[in-house]
Amino acid sequence: TIEKYLDAGHGACPLRSEQASACVADELAALADWQIDVPHYAIMPNHLHAMLVPGRGCVRSLSAIVKRLKGRSAHGIRLLIGGRGAIWQREWFDRWMRSDAEYRKCVDYIRNNPVKAGLVARWEEHRWTR
C-alpha cells in the first residue's frame, strides 16, 4: 500500500535524521510546560504518531498544542537541515479515547507503526518510539 511505502521512508523524509527526530522528541517533552503528558509516540521518517494527554491544569486547545509542536519543531529542524518549505503537512488527525480498550488499541497502533513499516522487527528497537 501507499501507506507502507511512505512509512518505510520513501519520498520526502524530513524526520529521517537523528537530529531532526531528537528535535521532535524534545518538543514533545517540552509540552509538559503546558501540562501535556506524551506517554506514547513514534517519530517516523516522514510523520509522527503521538498520544497527547492534557492534565487538569491544561487550558490550551488541541489546535494550539499541535500548532506549537509543529511550529517549534519545524523551526528547530530548519536550523539543523536548512532549506525552505514545510516540514509538516497542514492537516492533522485526532482520536478521542473513551475506554481502556480504545487506549490500548491506540498504544499498540503507535508502537507497531515502525514495525509495520519495516523499520524494525520489534517496536522496542526503534529509538524514536515510546
Regions found by a protein language model. Give the residues of each.
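Short catalytic/metal-binding and nucleic-acid-binding patches
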Residues: 1-130
